[in-house]
Amino acid sequence: MNKPTILRLIKYLSISFLSLVIAAIVLGGGVFFYYVSKAPSLSESKLVATTSSKIYDNKNQLIADLGSERRVNAQANDIPTDLVKAIVSIEDHRFFDHRGIDTIRILGAFLRNLQSNSLQGGSALTQQLIKLTYFSTSTSDQTISRKAQEAWLAIQLEQKATKQEILTYYINKVYMSNGNYGMQTAAQNYYGKDLNNLSLPQLALLAGMPQAPNQYDPYSHPEAAQDRRNLVLSEMKNQGYISAEQYEKAVNTPITDGLQSLKSASNYPAYMDNYLKEVINQVEEETGYNLLTTGMDVYTNVDQEAQKHLWDIYNTDEYVAYPDDELQVASTIVDVSNGKVIAQLGARHQSSNVSFGINQAVETNRDWGSTMKPITDYAPALEYGVYESTATIVHDEPYNYPGTNTPVYNWDRGYFGNITLQYALQQSRNVPAVETLNKVGLNRAKTFLNGLGIDYPSIHYSNAISSNTTESDKKYGASSEKMAAAYAAFANGGTYYKPMYIHKVVFSDGSEKEFSNVGTRAMKETTAYMMTDMMKTVLSYGTGRNAYLAWLPQAGKTGTSNYTDEEIENHIKTSQFVAPDELFAGYTRKYSMAVWTGYSNRLTPLVGNGLTVAAKVYRSMMTYLSEGSNPEDWNIPEGLYRNGEFVFKNGARSTWSSPAPQQPPSTESSSSSSDSSTSQSSSTTPSTNNSTTTNPNNNTQQSNTTPDQQNQNPQPAQP
């Protein structure tokens, strides 16, 4: 190829490339202007507006008007320079250099997204203000069209307002936790001072809160708040806004420095605080909007009377005799037909001064013990055909965790030998549970749990009798919310419904979004019925006698977690039976409820009557919900048949010779309720060799046992 030909080829390619670039620019520009033509109009009234959201219960009665409680706007000349430096350091280094969008930041975010295959933001401070004012923050709404509109409005705002005015809008717009809107409001209520009278570390704390105000709340999460404050200070030092000496002094200042006691900021009943926190979270999850900064009407699923009654059960001795005021309770109640959360409460004696603090009802940081057995072991075994009846014989005998030399112990260190599946669950024996999980297989059990809304990063044989996991963060493991929803699938015949706190949102422009819960099939109807039939006996003759009600068809399971040998030796130092957590999960045809009890400090043990509180809270609440409602029992579905006390799948051979029916619980001792812990005679629940129980080491509590009762011998419940 000669030189002139090469030159012509280069010229042709150059022109073609340039044409493509121009075409791309024109096309991109056309698309951009199409998107921005649909953007909302920039309005100062929206930038400075005091928004509020009204929250309603399931009867459309107003519960709360959020956003109207506390808002004191700062004036531009009252904003200290150190606060401005702190905000731009942590949020937008080049705020004073760009005109609404930071192209360098956008390019950096783009490159990081390519490298990590994830989505990272490149929004400048002005764009954040626009987003807070006009748009959803949901990841699913981070579309090209939305980003184009956001950038366009940011550029427009930069042309119409000064940097100082934009900062003032932002400072007054952001939510600052505990019912405080705007940084001036937070300064007054956290420190009793105006912004211009705060110290450097105090201003750094406020500057760092808007990205996750409840997570960085210095009252509820002081460690996280301190880490965030110190990150802000580090950025200020890196940007040259403060000296190394100022930095060292500030980071060594206690996070509590200057904090005053919170005053109640809420205009809603204290018993609604935990529930409203979950409403806020679910609204943002489902719509992308934060109702604390975006005005809307939210219609929830809470039964306010039930919520109030649950509060009364927690905070009076009228229903349950609590051993002390420090023992804590967390529970969730769902409608089994649709997953609607009708009531939820995360603690007793909650401070009225903290809004939207920790809600233990949704936390997964405590162990749910043997309440996991029905959903991890026995239901999967029935679902996948490992067992064909509730009379299937399982083995309660010396057994090691599969693949190890570590023995599985029952709570009493004894063994019942060959027993029925029903009796193993009724008496909460650990060995048959672990053996069953081994037969099911870890992968199939994990899949089954996922179908019930419970996930683990990985599952282990110890999960046969506990929910312990080292990775929690609310995603993994169990909580009262997750367990109530999971057990609801037993109650309704096998369908899992995601817990729902909201059913409709009406936005400020009049548009509506409704939320229906279709549900997904988690197990066969036959599996759900067989599990229910077995768990009925847990309340009648097993470990759940404190929840028993003679007139109410219901089923459930107890749970108890354990201390390690090291914890007992170093911290507990008692020969009494103790536990860090006591649980109960149960249900009727209408409602499912899960209850956690324990102390905030896990090393404070439950002992004596404290170990009966979970079941008694459940019984009190189910009594309230079910009295006068003519509660119905479950009907045996097609595909099953009954032989005496047991249920068999069609086609399964019934070789079991049924004994005489179990004696129903006595109604003559109802005055003592189920508070009695006196051992009575054993029920007649079958075991092929109950008389040969062995107990090699009855006095030692081991870390891997999961006891659910204090009495060695099974006894009928008292109504």
Curated annotation (Swiss-Prot):
Disruption phenotype: Not essential, it can be deleted. Its main location: secreted. It catalyses: [GlcNAc-(1->4)-Mur2Ac(oyl-L-Ala-gamma-D-Glu-L-Lys-D-Ala-D-Ala)](n)-di-trans,octa-cis-undecaprenyl diphosphate + beta-D-GlcNAc-(1->4)-Mur2Ac(oyl-L-Ala-gamma-D-Glu-L-Lys-D-Ala-D-Ala)-di-trans,octa-cis-undecaprenyl diphosphate = [GlcNAc-(1->4)-Mur2Ac(oyl-L-Ala-gamma-D-Glu-L-Lys-D-Ala-D-Ala)](n+1)-di-trans,octa-cis-undecaprenyl diphosphate + di-trans,octa-cis-undecaprenyl diphosphate + H(+); Preferential cleavage: (Ac)2-L-Lys-D-Ala-|-D-Ala. Also transpeptidation of peptidyl-alanyl moieties that are N-acyl substituents of D-alanine. It holds the Pfam family Transpeptidase. Residues 62-223 are annotated as: Transglycosylase. The active site is at residues 91, 370. The keyword Hydrolase applies. Its EC number is 2.4.99.28, 3.4.16.4. This is Penicillin-binding protein 1A.
